[in-house]
Amino acid sequence: MKVYRDLYSNDEVCSDAYDHLDPFDNPDLSSVAFEVKTSKVAKGEEDYGIGYNDEEGGDQMNVDPNVEVVVDVVDKFALQSLPLTKKDYSSYIKKYIQRLVATLQEKNPERVEPFKTSVSEFVKHVLANFDDFEFYVGESLDYEAGLVYGYYKGEEVSPRLVFLKDGLVEERY
């Protein structure tokens, strides 16, 4: 099993237990990011998401009001919601990309130019669809670490989460 940690905060943010998909159904961005499909699960009800996932026609309306319904990846990795304005995001992402580029220049210089090209397209997509996104950070609440990008695709009841690959460290267990 692989676990993905944030490069700067060291927070666990995802694992390979979730299929990695092309971000926003755009294969051109797969060199810089991956997307995972989440499910809503009833915490403490131990249905393991079966009753609430899209494929099984899950119906949230039949949830016991005393049971908390959570997004599986957000809950498992203790991701914290981070409200951002477009201006805040623009300021953050410029600094974060500079930080990642500096790290890449030190550790993997041949990756710098492809990263810059792809991440530019990624950021353009986020800014063009900004109101459709929710943002998360790892459990340490390190606001200088990487963001997790959440958005809802079509009529899905659970968000898709998108991660920038170069901001993650892969660990095998």
From Swiss-Prot:
Keyword Transit peptide (UniProt): no
A GO term for molecular function: calcium ion binding
Primary site of residence: cytoplasm
Cellular location(s): Cytoplasm
Occurrences of domain TCTP (ranges): 1-173
SUPFAM superfamilies given in the database record: Mss4-like
UniProt GO cellular component terms: cytoplasm
Disulphide bond pairs: none
Annotated keywords: Calcium, Cytoplasm
Function: Involved in calcium binding and microtubule stabilization.
Family: Belongs to the TCTP family.
Name this protein carries in UniProt: Translationally-controlled tumor protein homolog
Organism of provenance: Theileria annulata
Recorded name of the encoding gene: TCTP
